[in-house]
Amino acid sequence: MNTALYLIDVTNRDGVQTSRILLPKLSKTMLNLYLDEMGVYQSEIGFPTLKHEINYINANLDLVKAGGIKRLHLEGWCRALPEDVELSFKNCPGLRHLNISVSTSPIMIQGKFQGRKTWKDVVESMYKSAKLAKQLGVVTLGVNAEDASRTDLDKLIEFALAAKEAGADRMRYCDTLGVDDPITIYERIKALALATKVPIEMHCHNDLGMAGAVSVAGAQGAFESNVDSYINTTINGYGERAGNCDLVSTILALKFSHALKAKIALDEHINLKTAWKIAKYASYAFNIPIPIKQPGVGANAFAHESGIHADGALKDRRSYELYDPEDVGRGEPELLETGRIITTGEYGGLKGFRHAYDKLGISFHNDSEARRILELVQYANLHTQKPLTDDELRFIANYPEIVQKILVVQP
């Protein structure tokens, strides 16, 4: 059986739950475009049950139809409740990929539900929700076991088999508190996958600094059990508390670790050369600096100072570097304009607007068309509360109707 490992990026759902951080809907859309360019399998785009997400989600589904997003699956997240599933499809009828989530550990069932639900109730609610999702047209369905790492293995097997019977395509094993270690999760996932033959999706948090190692180890356990495996990532590791498994670090580990690259077949569509672009944009959009030591994309990822290291790197970079800056899309000089600058935005006029777009090689048929795009640029600048990037300006010009829907938050 040919199995592979796929990446499901959850930046637009879990990453945006980072406390004290906001991400505009336009920025979420740009991340989906970059994830698609990177070859990532799926993006968890948000909550179809939330009113302020409806236009953004539907606009991104329109973007798929328009060919702006080519391969990336757009997946919504909701609770494993039939009423949530029903509301998701009422709000976003074009949704074809979904993950439904419920707590499975004794501490969460007791702590959250305060005696109102038992283990049997949890499984039954998940089963009914999964069946309904499939009936409503879901093509790929993931069923999430929240706090799986503190759930007994026999319970997880029961949960996964019930999900499989209901039509689920995979089970998400959530190490919600980052409590698992690589050896333990490898053993648990291998046993779970062998017992159920259900593809396993790893969702690991970084509370103990092991999210990447734990995710990869768990995926290896699934892979060795001859089922497809999935790793949830976020760009730059953003997420609740100490964050999630970092997208770029995970790809680097799977591509360049001597043992892993021989054991696990990473999705062939992954294009690592887009790493710098997506990490840099996410840092700008979230307003969170990239740590200087971040693998692949940090300022010091390819920096050498000590005598022995500098001498070795100059003679043969393989002495002290596993990969080249070019492998992650770095190495080219990035110019900073220091002379006269004409920008366009919230208070921009037609002349400055046309000048900015001329520099991008984009022209307009007439003033009427230009004024329409200018108005969207003004609203987009107000929406993001920061200067628009060149790629954002290009996107607005190419898909004005979709952008207009994204910028209207109230449905």
Where are these regions (language model features)?
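A mid-to-C-terminal "edge-of-domain" accessory segment
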Residues: A4-L5, D9-T11, L252, K261-P411
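Hydrophobic alpha-helical scaffolding
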Residues: I21, G46, C78, S149, ...
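Glycine-rich loop at the start of a catalytic domain that most often binds anionic cofactors/ligands
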Residues: H52-A66
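Short catalytic-loop micro-motif centered on adjacent basic/acidic residues
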Residues: Q42-G46, H73-G76, G142-N144, R172, ...
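Catalytic alpha/beta core domains of metabolic enzymes, predominantly
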Residues: L177-S319
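Active-site beta-loop-alpha junctions enriched in small/polar residues
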Residues: V10-R13, P48-L50, W77-L81, S101-S105, ...
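Alpha/beta enzyme core
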Residues: L5-L7, Q17-Y41, D62-G68, P82-V198, ...
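General structural feature for long, well-ordered alpha-helical segments within catalytic domains
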Residues: S27, L31, E53-Y56, D84, ...
